[in-house]
Curated annotation (Swiss-Prot):
The chain crosses the membrane at residues 112-142, 150-174, 190-218, 226-253, 270-295, 307-331, 339-368. This is Corticotropin-releasing factor receptor 1. It is found in: Cell membrane; Endosome. Residues 99-108 are annotated as: Important for peptide agonist binding. Keywords: Cell membrane, Disulfide bond, Endosome, G-protein coupled receptor, Glycoprotein, Membrane, Phosphoprotein, Receptor, Signal, Transducer, Transmembrane, Transmembrane helix. The gene is Crhr1.
Length: 415
């Protein structure tokens, strides 16, 4: 594949030998480009080759580098790669120009498709692992009633929001085909709205985590005064009118392609993206204040409640940047460089798909209260079954030596 562009250019050079591309106008432009160079001694004069590439005035014995042509004989080339030509020691240009690195955009599109398919596999794998981990965490919070305080209820709801988001992601991937995407049927728009709603709830439940910690640590209010319904309204309630407003905007201004993507000049997606960015920034402010208090006032405190707060803060410190980084990446332009684009695609796919896994690990599997409750349950189960086993063994002995001798005595007496 690497030789194909070079062969195409060589064939073109043979054809162009009969009808040179180089003109006096091109030569003049190339000469003007060389005026800025400060070259002394033996040198190669400015020259335009048969492809149309300008080789500026250069010192003898130097390998000169120029970008590949952008468009040649109906084929687009990647201008981030280079062609090479040697200025010989005698001050003349080498007859051969090395265009071996100049690749057709078509080949790069094929490479992009390969990277896209790998990214899709990473996405499916990550969402599967995340969904399994989230479901396990959900069941643990459901079964372990002994740890059901407000702090863990907030964790539980955050995990539920991620489960629903992961589930709707699979619905989108498995049902919205290119044909459905173009037809813009009502049900696919509802699926998109549901996915975006659960996406927003993730951020608002993370905001609930920040509110709880900020209230308990920075404002030093008793958490007994906080109520579950307040956080339910924040996490599940507030995103609903936001998505309704977004859906109305899409319906009137961008009603196409199942409401995925956006048309140039239409900014309806900012109706829900704006609040997400806002709560993300507020959470960063909360975390700054929380860490400041923990580093100064609560460092010496060793109460169990303070220890739990510290662990919750550590989890939030890890998870909030994860959520923030993945979302802010959508606003980053990876540039034209192929390596940058590939790194961007893989990095974004990994973080986006494994978010749920990280949430379940930090808020459930590494939660000391959850682990302690599981150990207690396990010990109770072992004790219960060991007692049953002892009783069962005692009851399952058919005859003991005492019972045998008594039975024998009874028989002999009867005789």
């Amino acid at each position: 594949m690497g030789r194909r562009p070079q062969l195409r250019l060589v064939k073109a050079l043979l054809l162009l030998g009969l009808n040179p591309v180089s003109t006096s106008l091109q030569d003049q432009r190339c000469e003007n480009l060389s005026l800025t160079s400060n070259v002394s001694g033996l040198q190669c004069n400015a020259s335009v080759d048969l492809i149309g590439t300008c080789w500026p005035r250069s010192p003898a014995g130097q390998l000169v580098v120029r970008p590949c042509p952008a468009f040649f004989y109906g084929v687009r080339y990647n201008t981030t790669n280079n062609g090479y030509r040697e200025c010989l020691a005698n001050g003349s240009w080498a007859a051969r120009v090395n265009y071996s690195e100049c690749q057709e955009i078509l080949n790069e599109e094929k490479k992009s498709k390969v990277h896209y398919h790998v990214a899709v596999i990473i996405n499916y794998l990550g969402h599967c692992i995340s969904l399994v981990a989230l479901l396990v965490a959900f069941v643990l919070f459901l079964r372990l009633r002994s740890i059901r305080c407000l702090r863990n209820i907030i964790h539980w709801n955050l995990i539920s929001a991620f489960i629903l988001r992961n589930a709707t992601w699979f619905v989108v991937q498995l049902t919205v085909s290119p044909e459905v995407h173009q037809s813009n049927v009502a049900w696919c728009r509802l699926v998109t709205a549901a996915y975006n709603y659960f996406h927003v709830t993730n951020f608002f439940w993370m905001f609930g985590e920040g509110c709880y910690l900020h209230t308990a640590i920075v404002l030093t209010y008793s958490t007994d005064r906080l109520r579950k319904w307040m956080f339910v309204c924040i996490g599940w309630g507030v995103p609903f009118p936001i998505i309704v407003a977004w859906a109305i905007g899409k319906l009137h201004y961008d009603n196409e392609k199942c409401w995925f993507g956006k048309r140039p000049g239409v900014y309806t997606d900012y109706i829900y993206q704006g609040p997400m960015i806002l709560v993300l920034l507020i959470n960063f402010i909360f975390l700054f204040n929380i860490v400041r208090i923990l580093m100064t006032k609560l460092r010496a405190s060793t109460t169990s409640e303070t220890i739990q707060y510290r662990k919750a803060v550590k989890a939030t410190l890890v998870l909030l940047p994860l959520l923030g980084i993945t979302y802010m990446l959508f606003f980053v332009n990876p540039g034209e460089d192929e390596v940058s684009r590939v790194v961007f695609i893989y990095f974004n796919s990994f973080l986006e798909s494994f978010q749920g896994f990280f949430v379940s690990v930090f808020y459930c599997f590494l939660n000391s209260e959850v682990r302690s409750a599981i150990r207690k349950r396990w010990r109770r189960w072992q004790d219960k079954h060991s007692i049953r086993a002892r009783v069962a063994r005692a009851m399952s002995i058919p005859t003991s030596p005492t019972r045998v001798s008594f039975h024998s005595i009874k028989q002999s007496t009867a005789v």
